[in-house]
């Protein structure tokens, strides 16, 4: 039996890692080993699959708890399989939900319907720019997944649909009941692994699975206003289930790259603009870029200080599922001149001599040093 790697080791985190630490490490590793960044590298592709499998378990609190207690045995048999756990729909497939349902089902008005089985979900990653997050963008995402076998049309049998029969053990239910102490619990059928069907004369291409591994490209529409770390779900774009089972879902984790000019905070966007000392003192009009590619002019009043903000309404990001928009803020930094010429130094020295202790010209400076003087005088 092949050695199964520890999921925490795969994600390079400790067993006490928080959800945020898991997500951060997952995104970093997914970007590093993504097939698009490592074309033709089978080792990177295998590593990428391991990373997604590990994160799929550890990001779910219930699955993580089961893994911490039972290790890989908690998910043996295809998850859910014989002896494994299925956490969908609230402890389905032999969990606490079935125990309490057996005890109280009749009093509660009968049993609930079983959750429909589907193929496995897929986790992948896409990186976009801040401009693309602002405007929205279509991206082609490459995924390596299992698709319906063309040779048997997904039935798993060389005989097609006629070669698939109702499971004789569970009679098509996909589950069997077993006595555990005082309780009767349901588990996935060990004969058909929960499919409710068995294959006669297995397909020689897919060996009765009904699915084969294949790389395909999926187009995803990333909406305007999407934030870094957003997860987009594409229903039915996951792995095919085989034997007529519906496909799972595709989850795309969006990463927004840092920008050289703009910083985002929610729906608002910030742009830091340096001003020369004379511009800040005398006042000026500057032209600044906007995230949509346009430019706009901003009037800077005389006497502007470092840290001053100027607000441009409606120039920020759109808010998802809303008509609202954020604002853009220009943050001013007054730059002290360096490498002065002799003439510039003389002018500044003359300016300093002229300004002196004029409170009106330098209220913060004058007030601060007055407080310092009072502080030391109080010590004497």
UniProtKB/Swiss-Prot annotation:
Q: Which domain of life is it from?
A: Bacteria
**In which residues is Zn(2+) 2 bound?**
167, 170, 189, 192
Pfam families xref list:
DnaJ, DnaJ_C, DnaJ_CXXCXGXG
Cofactor(s) of this protein = Zn(2+)
User: Is the Zinc keyword given for this protein?
Assistant: yes
Molecular function GO terms recorded: ATP binding; heat shock protein binding; unfolded protein binding; zinc ion binding
The leader peptide range reads none
GO CC list: cytoplasm
Zn finger (CR-type) ranges are 136-215
Tell me if Aminoacyl-tRNA synthetase is a UniProt keyword of this record: no
CXXCXGXG motif repeat ranges per the UniProt record: 149-156, 167-174, 189-196, 203-210
Q: Which residues form the J domain?
A: 6-71
Biological process terms from the Gene Ontology for this record are: chaperone cofactor-dependent protein refolding; DNA replication; protein refolding; response to heat
Q: Cellular location of this protein?
A: Cytoplasm
- Cofactor: how and how many bound: Binds 2 Zn(2+) ions per monomer.
Report keywords, A-Z. Chaperone, Cytoplasm, DNA replication, Metal-binding, Repeat, Stress response, Zinc, Zinc-finger
Q: Which residues bind Zn(2+) 1?
A: 149, 152, 203, 206
Instruction: Extract the HAMAP family matched here.
Output: DnaJ
**What is the role of this chain?**
Participates actively in the response to hyperosmotic and heat shock by preventing the aggregation of stress-denatured proteins and by disaggregating proteins, also in an autonomous, DnaK-independent fashion. Unfolded proteins bind initially to DnaJ; upon interaction with the DnaJ-bound protein, DnaK hydrolyzes its bound ATP, resulting in the formation of a stable complex. GrpE releases ADP from DnaK; ATP binding to DnaK triggers the release of the substrate protein, thus completing the reaction cycle.
Q: How does it assemble?
A: Homodimer.
Q: What does the similarity note say?
A: Belongs to the DnaJ family.
Could you give the domain comment from the record? Answer: The J domain is necessary and sufficient to stimulate DnaK ATPase activity. Zinc center 1 plays an important role in the autonomous, DnaK-independent chaperone activity of DnaJ. Zinc center 2 is essential for interaction with DnaK and for DnaJ activity.
Query: What protein name is recorded for this chain?
Result: Chaperone protein DnaJ
Gene transcribed to yield this protein: dnaJ
């Amino acid at each position: 039996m092949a050695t199964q790697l520890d999921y925490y080791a795969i994600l390079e985190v400790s067993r006490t890692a928080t959800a945020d630490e898991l997500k951060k490490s997952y995104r970093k590793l997914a970007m590093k080993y993504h097939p698009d960044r490592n074309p033709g590298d089978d080792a990177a592709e295998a590593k990428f699959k391991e990373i997604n499998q590990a994160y799929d378990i550890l990001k779910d609190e219930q699955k993580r708890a089961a893994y911490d207690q039972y290790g890989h045995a908690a998910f043996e048999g295809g998850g859910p399989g014989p002896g494994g756990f299925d956490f969908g729909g609230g402890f389905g497939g032999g969990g606490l939900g079935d125990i309490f349902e057996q005890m109280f089902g009749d009093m509660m008005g009968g049993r609930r319907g079983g959750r429909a089985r589907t193929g496995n979900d897929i986790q992948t990653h896409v990186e976009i720019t801040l401009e693309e997050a602002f405007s929205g963008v279509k991206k082609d995402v490459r995924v390596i997944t299992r698709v319906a076998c063309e040779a048997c049309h997904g039935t798993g049998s060389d005989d097609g649909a006629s070669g698939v029969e109702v499971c004789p053990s569970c009679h098509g239910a996909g589950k069997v009941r077993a006595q555990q102490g005082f309780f009767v619990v349901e588990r996935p059928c060990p004969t058909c692994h929960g499919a409710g069907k068995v294959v006669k004369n297995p397909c020689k291409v897919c060996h009765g699975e009904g699915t084969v591994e294949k790389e395909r490209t999926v187009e995803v529409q990333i909406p305007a206003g999407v934030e870094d770390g957003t997860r987009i779900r594409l229903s039915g774009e996951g792995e095919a289930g085989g034997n007529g089972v519906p496909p799972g879902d595709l989850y795309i984790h969006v990463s927004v790259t840092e920008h050289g000019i703009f910083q985002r905070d929610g729906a608002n966007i910030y742009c830091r603009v340096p001003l020369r000392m004379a511009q800040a003192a005398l006042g000026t009009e500057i032209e600044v870029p906007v995230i949509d590619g346009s430019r706009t002019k901003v009037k800077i009043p005389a006497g502007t200080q470092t840290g001053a903000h100027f607000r441009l309404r409606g120039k920020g990001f759109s808010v998802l599922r809303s008509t609202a928009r954020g604002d853009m803020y220009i943050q001013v930094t007054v730059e002290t001149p360096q490498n002065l010429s002799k003439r510039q130094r003389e002018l500044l020295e003359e300016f300093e001599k002229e300004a002196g202790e004029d409170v009106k010209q330098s209220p913060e400076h004058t007030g601060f040093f007055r407080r310092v003087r009072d502080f030391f005088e109080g010590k004497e």
